[in-house]
Design a protein with these regions (language model features):
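N-terminal cap/lid segment of alpha/beta-hydrolase-fold proteins
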Residues: 33-78
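Short beta-strand element of the alpha/beta-hydrolase
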Residues: 70, 80-91
Length: 307
């Protein structure tokens, strides 16, 4: 499968693997939308957690789309605050939704951070098993647009400093984020957790397309590294697990190589769920430093043991 994918990529991107400006702009046009369209934000309720307010909301990315469930986590005060868009993984049902990073967002709020936590299309029950591969292309484009609209919503808040915005995504939340951020480029820092270089790497675990060759051709404009390469003047933290059966060490090298500097790659004694305290502590420290909220940033890696 990877050999076939490589052939497609070379045909589309040329020998260097990097798209020229005109080629990328043609791809970016797939994700255009009307920024003036009403997001139709509706609030279902608000919960106070200490001094932090957690707003339960829905918004409509584009006219006719299904509303997206989200939380907005807001600290006490007028701001301006840093802002972060968080997007969950596809994994355990309990956390395959907007709650995955909620505790982190609440803990970070008093330090000066507004968070928007949204649900992706993969939050639907048995989303992966029910997918129709021939619909992946259209659904992927809609998902990227929905993430761009989520960024619109976050930045529309008068208490959010547009110059201090970040993005955190795990698994599909990171991979669709790579596309959205490569087109959007409004964030100052990114954290991508347990991601691979191509959506195609995870496309064939269940239902198979009628024609794999046709599937690869259709989805070639969605190659994640094309979008990673577009982001300049921003920092990126990649977090990976040493026991991840879905992400190889070679995968981590590919995405790390596609990102611009400054960038950092960290590994943890975890599986794909990345549910270890050090991973959360590191990304929170990264966000605080990169978004101007203080703190020393990532702790240094331990020195190798002497032989």
């Amino acid at each position: 499968m990877r050999a076939a994918l490589l052939a497609v990529l070379l045909a589309v991107a040329g020998p260097t693997g990097a798209l020229c400006a005109d080629e990328f702009e043609a791809q970016a046009a797939l994700f255009r939308y009307d920024p003036a369209a009403d997001l139709k934000v509706e609030e279902a309720g608000v919960e106070k957690q200490g001094t932090v307010s957690v707003h339960d909301i829905r918004f409509t990315p584009v006219p006719g789309a299904e509303p997206v469930k989200a939380y907005i986590v807001v600290p006490e005060g007028k701001g301006p605050f840093a802002g972060v868009l968080w997007v969950h993984w596809l994994g355990e049902p309990a956390t395959t939704n907007r709650t995955q990073f909620l505790k982190e967002a609440v803990d970070l709020a008093p330090k000066g951070m507004v968070s928007l936590l949204v649900e992706g299309m993969w939050s639907a029950p048995d989303w992966y098993g029910k997918r129709v591969p021939e619909q992946d292309y259209d659904h992927s484009i809609r998902q990227v647009v929905a993430l761009r609209r989520a960024m619109d919503l976050l930045l529309s808040r008068p208490d959010v400093d547009k110059a201090r915005v970040g993005y955190v995504g795990h698994d599909y939340g990171g991979m669709y984020g790579m596309m959205a951020n490569g087109v959007d480029r409004r964030a100052r820092t990114y954290v991508y957790i347990a991601v691979v270089p191509s959506l195609n790497d995870w496309a064939f675990f269940a239902r198979q397309p009628v024609s794999k060759a046709a599937y690869l051709r259709q989805n070639a404009p969605l190659e994640l590294t094309d979008y990673l390469r577009q982001v300049k003047n921003a920092s990126t933290l990649f977090q990976f697990a040493n026991k991840d059966v879905y992400v190889s060490r070679a995968d981590t090298q590919v995405v790390m190589g596609a990102a611009s500097t400054p960038k950092e790659r960290r590994f943890y004694e975890a599986d794909h769920g990345m549910a270890v305290p050090q991973a959360a502590a590191d990304r929170d420290a990264w966000l605080l430093k990169e978004l101007g909220l203080g703190g020393p940033g990532l702790p240094p890696l331990p020195s190798p043991s002497p032989r």
